[in-house]
Amino acid sequence: MMSGSNIHFEMAERGRALNYGGIGAIHLMGQRLGLAQEIDRRLQLLKRHLPYHESDHVLNLAYNALLDGQRLEDIELRRNDEAFLDGLGAQRIPDPTTSGDFTRRFDQDSLLTLMEAINATREQVWEKQPEDFLSQAFIDTDGTIAGTLGECKGGMALSYKGIWGYAPLIITLANTREVLYLVNRPGNAVSHEGCVPWIDRATQVGTSTCR
């Protein structure tokens, strides 16, 4: 027999939650490491900061990708997510159109500046690791194929697999699988094309940390 005599009901206030709880931990880590300040110090793309700084745009794009965003338009979902905004302590974030305008301000030099800002912040994490953390550092290079949805985007080409897109060069620290540098190339580029100067640059990252 089902009497239901052990059922209790409680009324609670309406709550808010995130689908991706880890974004808060990532944001907090970036704050403690001073990532935003390092980006703003090095990267100068905006003449005025009303109201956003370079770091606001960079982190906005990064968080969109981390939350499974596939395109700039997906940022609009975050703009209307009060729980997400509260989690970041933000009243608002850049809209998709503003974010698109920001990406078009980049050239090769500014992209390199951004990667170096991230690497400089990354070294703070390495310095806090055990003494033998980077007693040996292994640099890994590889090329991959990044397909696109169109055939008319600037710089793309047909890969040897018959896929239209790009063939980015990825330079990583094999010890931790961290991407140190990412270099975009046409889809028909061979894996090793242009890798030597980037390997040389990667060997300079974290030299003060290697023991």
Q: Which residue stretches match the model-derived regions?
A:
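Dynamic "connector" segments at or just before major functional cores
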Residues: 1-209
